[in-house]
Amino acid sequence: MAPPLHGESRAASWWRILGACLLAAVFLLAASSDACVLPPPFEAMEPINPKPYYEIGEKVEYRCKKGYLRQPFYLMVATCEKNHSWVPITDDGCIKKQCTYLNPPPKGRVEYINGTRTWGDIVHFSCVEGFYVSGIAALSCELRGDNVDWNGRVPTCEKVLCSPPPKIQNGKYTFSDVQVFEYFEAVTYSCDAVQGPDKLSLVGNEVLYCAGHQKWSSAAPECKVVKCPLPVVKNGKQISGLGQTFFYQATVTFQCLPGFYFNGSSTVVCGSDNTWKPSIPECLKGPKPTHPTKPPVYNYPGYPNPREGIFDQELNLWIIILLILIAVVGLALILLCACRFFERKKKSPEKVMPAIQISDHMVNAPILMPSTVQNPMKR
Protein backbone atom coordinates (compact mmCIF):
# COMPACT_ATOMS: atom_id res chain seq x y z
CA MET A 1 0.00 0.00 0.00
CA ALA A 2 1.37 3.39 -1.01
CA PRO A 3 2.01 5.92 1.77
CA PRO A 4 -0.46 8.85 1.96
CA LEU A 5 0.46 12.06 0.22
CA HIS A 6 1.59 15.03 2.28
CA GLY A 7 -1.35 17.06 0.95
CA GLU A 8 -3.94 14.54 2.17
CA SER A 9 -2.32 14.31 5.60
CA ARG A 10 -2.24 18.09 5.89
CA ALA A 11 -5.93 18.36 4.90
CA ALA A 12 -6.94 15.80 7.54
CA SER A 13 -5.04 17.76 10.18
CA TRP A 14 -6.84 20.95 9.18
CA TRP A 15 -10.24 19.24 9.51
CA ARG A 16 -9.36 18.01 13.02
CA ILE A 17 -8.30 21.51 14.07
CA LEU A 18 -11.48 23.00 12.61
CA GLY A 19 -13.68 20.47 14.48
CA ALA A 20 -11.95 21.23 17.77
CA CYS A 21 -12.37 24.96 17.21
CA LEU A 22 -16.09 24.58 16.48
CA LEU A 23 -16.59 22.50 19.61
CA ALA A 24 -14.72 25.05 21.71
CA ALA A 25 -16.76 27.82 20.14
CA VAL A 26 -19.99 26.12 21.19
CA PHE A 27 -18.87 25.94 24.81
CA LEU A 28 -17.55 29.50 24.77
CA LEU A 29 -20.78 30.73 23.26
CA ALA A 30 -22.76 28.96 25.93
CA ALA A 31 -20.60 30.41 28.69
CA SER A 32 -20.47 33.94 27.32
CA SER A 33 -24.12 34.20 26.33
CA ASP A 34 -25.52 32.77 29.57
CA ALA A 35 -26.70 29.58 27.87
CA CYS A 36 -26.62 25.84 28.63
CA VAL A 37 -24.95 23.20 26.52
CA LEU A 38 -26.55 19.89 25.54
CA PRO A 39 -28.96 18.50 28.16
CA PRO A 40 -27.78 15.48 30.17
CA PRO A 41 -28.13 12.06 28.50
CA PHE A 42 -30.09 9.20 30.06
CA GLU A 43 -30.27 5.46 29.54
CA ALA A 44 -34.05 5.23 29.33
CA MET A 45 -35.06 8.55 27.73
CA GLU A 46 -33.86 11.02 25.11
CA PRO A 47 -34.50 14.75 24.44
CA ILE A 48 -37.05 15.80 21.84
CA ASN A 49 -35.55 17.95 19.06
CA PRO A 50 -32.22 18.62 20.83
CA LYS A 51 -30.21 21.80 20.03
CA PRO A 52 -26.49 22.64 20.39
CA TYR A 53 -27.24 25.05 23.25
CA TYR A 54 -30.17 26.46 25.21
CA GLU A 55 -30.83 29.90 26.63
CA ILE A 56 -31.47 30.51 30.32
CA GLY A 57 -35.02 29.57 31.23
CA GLU A 58 -35.45 27.45 28.12
CA LYS A 59 -36.81 23.96 28.66
CA VAL A 60 -36.15 20.65 26.95
CA GLU A 61 -38.69 17.86 26.96
CA TYR A 62 -37.73 14.18 27.09
CA ARG A 63 -39.41 11.07 25.78
CA CYS A 64 -38.86 7.38 26.51
CA LYS A 65 -36.54 5.44 24.24
CA LYS A 66 -37.61 2.35 22.35
CA GLY A 67 -38.34 -0.54 24.65
CA TYR A 68 -39.29 1.73 27.57
CA LEU A 69 -42.74 2.60 28.89
CA ARG A 70 -43.80 6.07 30.11
CA GLN A 71 -44.82 6.28 33.77
CA PRO A 72 -47.18 9.02 35.02
CA PHE A 73 -46.35 11.58 37.71
CA TYR A 74 -42.66 11.82 36.75
CA LEU A 75 -40.96 15.01 35.56
CA MET A 76 -39.85 14.71 31.94
CA VAL A 77 -38.78 18.33 31.40
CA ALA A 78 -35.42 19.94 32.27
CA THR A 79 -34.85 23.71 32.54
CA CYS A 80 -31.65 25.67 31.81
CA GLU A 81 -30.70 27.59 34.96
CA LYS A 82 -28.65 30.80 35.37
CA ASN A 83 -25.55 28.89 36.45
CA HIS A 84 -25.48 27.12 33.05
CA SER A 85 -26.72 23.84 34.56
CA TRP A 86 -29.92 21.88 34.15
CA VAL A 87 -32.57 21.26 36.77
CA PRO A 88 -31.77 17.69 37.81
CA ILE A 89 -34.24 15.06 36.68
CA THR A 90 -34.07 11.26 36.51
CA ASP A 91 -35.20 8.69 34.00
CA ASP A 92 -37.33 6.86 36.54
CA GLY A 93 -40.35 7.88 34.51
CA CYS A 94 -39.34 5.37 31.82
CA ILE A 95 -39.25 1.68 32.71
CA LYS A 96 -38.35 -1.31 30.58
CA LYS A 97 -41.23 -2.97 28.82
CA GLN A 98 -42.07 -6.47 30.00
CA CYS A 99 -42.78 -9.61 28.04
CA THR A 100 -45.95 -11.54 28.77
CA TYR A 101 -46.01 -13.85 31.79
CA LEU A 102 -45.31 -17.47 30.87
CA ASN A 103 -47.04 -20.28 32.74
CA PRO A 104 -45.11 -23.50 33.38
CA PRO A 105 -46.08 -26.41 31.17
CA PRO A 106 -47.86 -29.42 32.68
CA LYS A 107 -45.38 -31.49 34.75
CA GLY A 108 -42.95 -28.60 34.41
CA ARG A 109 -41.45 -25.60 36.17
CA VAL A 110 -40.54 -22.08 35.07
CA GLU A 111 -37.78 -19.90 36.53
CA TYR A 112 -37.09 -16.26 35.67
CA ILE A 113 -33.32 -16.01 36.00
CA ASN A 114 -33.24 -12.37 37.17
CA GLY A 115 -36.65 -12.48 38.79
CA THR A 116 -38.02 -10.18 36.06
CA ARG A 117 -39.27 -10.55 32.49
CA THR A 118 -38.14 -7.30 30.87
CA TRP A 119 -36.31 -7.35 27.55
CA GLY A 120 -32.87 -8.87 27.96
CA ASP A 121 -34.07 -11.27 30.68
CA ILE A 122 -34.08 -15.06 30.33
CA VAL A 123 -36.61 -17.64 31.49
CA HIS A 124 -35.65 -21.29 32.03
CA PHE A 125 -37.95 -24.31 31.87
CA SER A 126 -37.50 -27.69 33.52
CA CYS A 127 -39.60 -30.78 34.17
CA VAL A 128 -40.33 -32.94 37.17
CA GLU A 129 -38.57 -36.28 37.56
CA GLY A 130 -39.62 -38.77 34.92
CA PHE A 131 -40.25 -36.09 32.28
CA TYR A 132 -37.98 -34.18 29.91
CA VAL A 133 -38.14 -30.80 28.15
CA SER A 134 -39.29 -31.07 24.55
CA GLY A 135 -38.42 -27.82 22.81
CA ILE A 136 -36.30 -24.82 23.78
CA ALA A 137 -35.48 -24.96 27.49
CA ALA A 138 -34.47 -21.27 27.74
CA LEU A 139 -36.24 -18.28 26.19
CA SER A 140 -35.15 -14.64 26.17
CA CYS A 141 -37.26 -11.49 26.11
CA GLU A 142 -36.18 -9.54 23.03
CA LEU A 143 -36.78 -6.01 21.78
CA ARG A 144 -38.50 -5.95 18.39
CA GLY A 145 -38.91 -2.41 17.18
CA ASP A 146 -40.76 -0.60 19.95
CA ASN A 147 -42.29 -3.79 21.34
CA VAL A 148 -40.96 -6.78 23.26
CA ASP A 149 -41.67 -10.49 22.87
CA TRP A 150 -40.22 -13.90 23.70
CA ASN A 151 -37.97 -15.47 21.10
CA GLY A 152 -39.78 -18.81 21.07
CA ARG A 153 -42.68 -20.93 22.24
CA VAL A 154 -43.09 -22.49 25.66
CA PRO A 155 -41.75 -26.07 25.57
CA THR A 156 -43.65 -29.13 26.76
CA CYS A 157 -42.76 -31.83 29.27
CA GLU A 158 -42.89 -35.31 27.79
CA LYS A 159 -42.67 -38.63 29.57
CA VAL A 160 -39.21 -40.21 29.70
CA LEU A 161 -39.16 -43.40 27.66
CA CYS A 162 -36.37 -45.74 26.58
CA SER A 163 -36.08 -48.17 23.73
CA PRO A 164 -34.92 -51.71 24.57
CA PRO A 165 -31.31 -51.86 25.79
CA PRO A 166 -28.57 -53.27 23.56
CA LYS A 167 -28.34 -57.00 23.08
CA ILE A 168 -25.03 -58.67 23.94
CA GLN A 169 -23.23 -61.65 22.47
CA ASN A 170 -23.41 -64.85 24.52
CA GLY A 171 -25.78 -63.17 26.96
CA LYS A 172 -29.29 -61.91 27.56
CA TYR A 173 -31.31 -59.52 29.73
CA THR A 174 -34.62 -59.73 31.53
CA PHE A 175 -37.88 -58.36 30.06
CA SER A 176 -36.55 -58.88 26.55
CA ASP A 177 -40.12 -58.88 25.20
CA VAL A 178 -40.79 -55.29 26.35
CA GLN A 179 -40.50 -52.70 23.57
CA VAL A 180 -40.82 -49.49 25.61
CA PHE A 181 -39.32 -48.91 29.06
CA GLU A 182 -40.50 -46.12 31.33
CA TYR A 183 -38.37 -43.98 33.59
CA PHE A 184 -36.29 -45.96 36.12
CA GLU A 185 -37.41 -49.36 34.84
CA ALA A 186 -34.46 -51.77 34.96
CA VAL A 187 -33.17 -54.91 33.29
CA THR A 188 -30.61 -57.46 34.49
CA TYR A 189 -27.98 -59.02 32.23
CA SER A 190 -26.58 -62.53 32.48
CA CYS A 191 -24.24 -64.71 30.43
CA ASP A 192 -25.10 -67.97 28.72
CA ALA A 193 -23.77 -71.24 30.02
CA VAL A 194 -21.04 -72.66 27.79
CA GLN A 195 -19.43 -76.05 27.51
CA GLY A 196 -15.85 -76.40 28.65
CA PRO A 197 -13.70 -75.60 31.65
CA ASP A 198 -13.76 -71.83 31.18
CA LYS A 199 -16.96 -69.99 32.05
CA LEU A 200 -18.14 -66.66 30.69
CA SER A 201 -17.86 -63.67 32.97
CA LEU A 202 -20.14 -60.64 32.87
CA VAL A 203 -17.83 -57.65 32.57
CA GLY A 204 -19.57 -54.35 33.31
CA ASN A 205 -22.74 -53.34 35.09
CA GLU A 206 -25.16 -56.18 35.61
CA VAL A 207 -28.22 -53.91 36.05
CA LEU A 208 -29.16 -51.08 33.68
CA TYR A 209 -32.10 -48.71 34.14
CA CYS A 210 -33.81 -46.04 32.05
CA ALA A 211 -32.14 -42.86 33.33
CA GLY A 212 -33.32 -40.32 30.73
CA HIS A 213 -35.15 -40.01 27.46
CA GLN A 214 -33.69 -42.78 25.29
CA LYS A 215 -30.74 -42.99 27.66
CA TRP A 216 -29.74 -45.98 29.77
CA SER A 217 -27.75 -45.65 32.97
CA SER A 218 -24.56 -47.11 31.44
CA ALA A 219 -23.22 -49.07 28.52
CA ALA A 220 -24.23 -52.68 28.20
CA PRO A 221 -21.86 -55.26 29.72
CA GLU A 222 -20.15 -58.02 27.75
CA CYS A 223 -19.78 -61.73 28.24
CA LYS A 224 -16.27 -63.05 27.77
CA VAL A 225 -13.76 -65.42 29.28
CA VAL A 226 -11.56 -63.68 31.83
CA LYS A 227 -8.82 -65.83 33.29
CA CYS A 228 -5.82 -64.61 35.25
CA PRO A 229 -2.59 -66.62 35.61
CA LEU A 230 -1.72 -68.46 38.79
CA PRO A 231 -0.43 -65.87 41.27
CA VAL A 232 2.92 -66.86 42.73
CA VAL A 233 4.82 -64.84 45.32
CA LYS A 234 8.37 -65.90 46.02
CA ASN A 235 9.04 -66.24 49.75
CA GLY A 236 5.30 -65.89 50.36
CA LYS A 237 2.07 -67.88 50.35
CA GLN A 238 -1.66 -67.50 49.69
CA ILE A 239 -3.87 -67.26 52.75
CA SER A 240 -7.23 -66.71 50.99
CA GLY A 241 -8.69 -67.21 47.53
CA LEU A 242 -6.95 -70.54 47.08
CA GLY A 243 -7.55 -72.37 43.82
CA GLN A 244 -6.15 -73.41 40.50
CA THR A 245 -8.36 -71.27 38.22
CA PHE A 246 -8.92 -67.57 38.70
CA PHE A 247 -11.75 -65.92 36.79
CA TYR A 248 -13.01 -62.34 36.68
CA GLN A 249 -12.96 -60.53 40.06
CA ALA A 250 -11.29 -63.44 41.83
CA THR A 251 -9.54 -62.11 44.96
CA VAL A 252 -6.33 -63.50 46.45
CA THR A 253 -4.54 -62.46 49.66
CA PHE A 254 -0.87 -63.23 50.36
CA GLN A 255 1.38 -63.45 53.39
CA CYS A 256 5.17 -63.25 53.49
CA LEU A 257 7.25 -65.92 55.20
CA PRO A 258 8.98 -65.03 58.49
CA GLY A 259 11.96 -62.74 57.91
CA PHE A 260 10.39 -61.15 54.81
CA TYR A 261 8.17 -58.11 54.28
CA PHE A 262 5.77 -56.95 51.58
CA ASN A 263 6.68 -54.60 48.75
CA GLY A 264 3.28 -53.93 47.25
CA SER A 265 -0.29 -54.82 48.10
CA SER A 266 -1.09 -58.03 49.95
CA THR A 267 -4.44 -58.38 48.10
CA VAL A 268 -4.92 -58.56 44.32
CA VAL A 269 -8.00 -58.88 42.11
CA CYS A 270 -8.36 -60.47 38.67
CA GLY A 271 -9.18 -57.66 36.22
CA SER A 272 -11.12 -57.70 32.97
CA ASP A 273 -7.88 -57.67 30.93
CA ASN A 274 -6.72 -61.04 32.38
CA THR A 275 -4.16 -59.41 34.68
CA TRP A 276 -3.97 -58.94 38.45
CA LYS A 277 -4.81 -55.52 39.86
CA PRO A 278 -2.60 -54.24 41.38
CA SER A 279 0.41 -56.22 40.25
CA ILE A 280 1.64 -59.24 42.21
CA PRO A 281 3.61 -58.05 45.28
CA GLU A 282 7.12 -59.06 46.35
CA CYS A 283 8.38 -60.45 49.63
CA LEU A 284 11.75 -58.87 50.38
CA LYS A 285 14.17 -60.23 52.92
CA GLY A 286 15.02 -58.31 56.07
CA PRO A 287 13.16 -56.14 58.56
CA LYS A 288 10.41 -53.93 57.28
CA PRO A 289 11.61 -50.32 56.81
CA THR A 290 10.39 -47.83 59.37
CA HIS A 291 9.06 -45.46 56.72
CA PRO A 292 8.39 -47.55 53.63
CA THR A 293 7.25 -46.07 50.40
CA LYS A 294 3.47 -46.25 50.30
CA PRO A 295 2.16 -48.23 47.33
CA PRO A 296 -0.75 -46.79 45.36
CA VAL A 297 -4.16 -47.74 46.70
CA TYR A 298 -6.53 -49.37 44.24
CA ASN A 299 -10.26 -49.73 44.66
CA TYR A 300 -11.43 -52.79 42.78
CA PRO A 301 -14.53 -54.84 43.48
CA GLY A 302 -13.75 -57.11 46.39
CA TYR A 303 -10.54 -55.26 47.25
CA PRO A 304 -10.74 -53.42 50.58
CA ASN A 305 -9.53 -49.88 50.93
CA PRO A 306 -7.01 -49.82 53.80
CA ARG A 307 -7.81 -46.18 54.58
CA GLU A 308 -11.51 -46.75 55.19
CA GLY A 309 -12.44 -46.35 58.87
CA ILE A 310 -8.88 -45.53 59.94
CA PHE A 311 -8.14 -42.25 61.68
CA ASP A 312 -5.39 -40.27 60.05
CA GLN A 313 -2.38 -40.94 62.28
CA GLU A 314 -0.19 -38.37 60.56
CA LEU A 315 -1.36 -35.53 62.78
CA ASN A 316 1.06 -32.66 62.88
CA LEU A 317 3.19 -32.83 66.05
CA TRP A 318 3.45 -29.05 66.28
CA ILE A 319 -0.33 -28.73 66.46
CA ILE A 320 -0.40 -31.14 69.42
CA ILE A 321 2.35 -29.17 71.22
CA LEU A 322 0.48 -25.91 70.60
CA LEU A 323 -2.74 -27.33 72.03
CA ILE A 324 -0.90 -28.54 75.16
CA LEU A 325 0.69 -25.10 75.70
CA ILE A 326 -2.69 -23.39 75.34
CA ALA A 327 -4.21 -25.77 77.90
CA VAL A 328 -1.36 -25.17 80.41
CA VAL A 329 -1.57 -21.38 80.08
CA GLY A 330 -5.33 -21.47 80.49
CA LEU A 331 -5.08 -23.61 83.63
CA ALA A 332 -2.47 -21.25 85.12
CA LEU A 333 -4.71 -18.25 84.52
CA ILE A 334 -7.63 -19.99 86.22
CA LEU A 335 -5.53 -20.85 89.30
CA LEU A 336 -4.17 -17.28 89.53
CA CYS A 337 -7.66 -15.80 89.44
CA ALA A 338 -8.84 -18.25 92.12
CA CYS A 339 -5.95 -17.35 94.46
CA ARG A 340 -6.63 -13.62 94.15
CA PHE A 341 -10.30 -14.17 94.87
CA PHE A 342 -9.63 -16.09 98.10
CA GLU A 343 -7.03 -13.51 99.26
CA ARG A 344 -9.53 -10.69 98.91
CA LYS A 345 -12.16 -12.70 100.74
CA LYS A 346 -9.86 -13.29 103.75
CA LYS A 347 -9.19 -9.58 104.23
CA SER A 348 -11.80 -8.19 106.69
CA PRO A 349 -12.99 -4.58 106.26
CA GLU A 350 -11.60 -1.91 108.61
CA LYS A 351 -13.74 -1.33 111.75
CA VAL A 352 -15.31 2.09 111.90
CA MET A 353 -15.87 3.58 115.38
CA PRO A 354 -19.46 4.54 116.01
CA ALA A 355 -20.14 8.26 116.08
CA ILE A 356 -20.67 9.72 119.58
CA GLN A 357 -23.49 12.14 119.90
CA ILE A 358 -22.57 15.17 122.03
CA SER A 359 -25.37 16.89 123.80
CA ASP A 360 -25.50 20.60 124.51
CA HIS A 361 -24.70 20.24 128.24
CA MET A 362 -21.57 18.30 127.47
CA VAL A 363 -20.08 21.01 125.34
CA ASN A 364 -19.18 23.19 128.35
CA ALA A 365 -18.09 20.27 130.57
CA PRO A 366 -14.43 20.33 131.70
CA ILE A 367 -12.06 17.99 130.00
CA LEU A 368 -10.43 15.54 132.41
CA MET A 369 -6.87 14.61 131.79
CA PRO A 370 -5.87 11.01 132.24
CA SER A 371 -3.94 11.82 135.42
CA THR A 372 -7.03 13.36 137.13
CA VAL A 373 -9.37 10.49 136.41
CA GLN A 374 -9.95 8.39 139.50
CA ASN A 375 -10.60 4.73 139.55
CA PRO A 376 -14.09 4.24 141.01
CA MET A 377 -12.98 1.05 142.68
CA LYS A 378 -10.58 2.99 144.95
CA ARG A 379 -13.26 5.18 146.45
UniProtKB/Swiss-Prot annotation:
Organism whose genome encodes this protein: Cavia porcellus
Span of domain Sushi: 36-96, 97-159, 160-225, 226-285
Positions on the Cytoplasmic side per record topology: 338-379
PANTHER family to which the protein is assigned, alphabetical: COMPLEMENT COMPONENT-RELATED SUSHI DOMAIN-CONTAINING, MEMBRANE COFACTOR PROTEIN
Database matches in CDD domains: CCP
Protein name according to UniProt: Membrane cofactor protein
Subunit structure comment from the entry: Interacts with C3b. Interacts with C4b. Interacts with moesin/MSN.
Role according to the record: May be involved in the fusion of the spermatozoa with the oocyte during fertilization.
Glycan attachment sites: N83, N114, N263, T290, T293
Pfam family, one: Sushi
High-level lineage: Eukaryota, Metazoa, Chordata, Craniata, Vertebrata
Cystine pairings recorded for this chain: C36-C80, C64-C94, C99-C141, C127-C157, C162-C210, C191-C223, C228-C270, C256-C283
Tissue: Preferentially expressed in testis.
UniProt keyword Disulfide bond present: yes
Membrane topology (UniProt): Single-pass type I membrane protein
Segments in the Extracellular topological domain: 36-316
Cellular component aspect of the GO annotation: cell surface; membrane
Subcellular location: Membrane
Transmembrane among keywords: yes
Gene name of the encoded protein: CD46
GO annotation terms (biological process): single fertilization
Residues annotated as signal peptide: 1-35
Transmembrane residue ranges: 317-337
UniProt keywords, alphabetically: Disulfide bond, Fertilization, Glycoprotein, Membrane, Repeat, Signal, Sushi, Transmembrane, Transmembrane helix
SUPFAM superfamilies: Complement control module/SCR domain (SSF57535)
Domain of life: Eukaryota
